[in-house]
Amino acid sequence: MKTTIIGCGYLGFALAEKLQKKHHFLTCTTVNPKSIEKLKKTTQKSLIMRGTDKNELSLILENNDTIIVTVEAKNSDEFENTYLQTAHTIKECAKEIETPKRIIFTSKTSVYGNLEGMWADESTPLKAKDDFAKILIDTENTIFSLNDLGWSVAILRLTQVYGGENHEIIDLFKKSYKEVMPGHKDYYTNMVHRDDVVGIISYIIDHDIKGIYNISDDEHPTREEFSKKICEKLNLKMPKYDPTLADFSDNNKRVANYRIKEKGYQFKHPRRII
């Protein structure tokens, strides 16, 4: 199978390693020149390219069966260009391609907005109010509209991904730890191990699954409960939480994962590894 991964970074590279072992012919793109040599060891073709480069993207889409979009914005200034404009470029190219493709897009559960602690499943209305989440919603809609061109579309709404490459929970906590942390202490946390995101994408390809799916593990401790476990392990002072310090849209929800389980996927890490 000919497969391309557009935006091969933290998640995309792990996915490339998985698919390479399953004998996919891989074309992977990155915007980071430092990643090229690493990608060359895993892929048949790798190139530096932005998702808005229509000429390059058109060739890639034409020559591959499965397109996986795992782009990630480096900063807020690049958010719209990285997500929405990439989606628009893909759709422009798709209109010129005769053979329908399969596309898998990794979105985020921030599209649900603040649900005040309620559960979010795939039927939950998208009520996000911050600009970044609105861009993701528009991006999802653009990708989903490829169904009209006969494409097979899967959208994965990821919670916070951890695992591997200095992204273990302990590593992430150490980087953000302060005696006073931003946010509400009683808000729920939602995470998923990178192994499961990679496993789910591979499973979706193998079983020709389409639609929208939340990707989260089974645990939803509050920030306070979660921090307590980590602080006990690291022998750190338990932080306090101050909502007024948050420079982000502080959303409270529990993300349900039953729909992907109903498709037969079994989580490798249903509980968090601390």
Positions of PLM-derived features:
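Alpha-helical substrate-binding/gating segment
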Residues: I170-V180, D186-Y213
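N-terminal Rossmann-fold NAD(P) dinucleotide-binding loop
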Residues: G12-F13
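NAD(P)-dependent short-chain dehydrogenase/reductase
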Residues: F144-Y188
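Conserved Rossmann-fold NAD(P)-dependent oxidoreductase catalytic core, especially the SDR/UDP-sugar
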Residues: T89-D131
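Catalytic helix-loop patch of NAD(P)-dependent Rossmann-fold dehydrogenases
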Residues: E116-I155
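Mid/C-terminal beta-alpha module of Rossmann-like enzyme folds, strongest
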Residues: V198-I200, D206-N251
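C-terminal amphipathic/interface module of NAD(P)-dependent oxidoreductases
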Residues: M49-K54, D247-I274
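NAD(P)-cofactor binding segment of oxidoreductase domains
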Residues: N64-I104
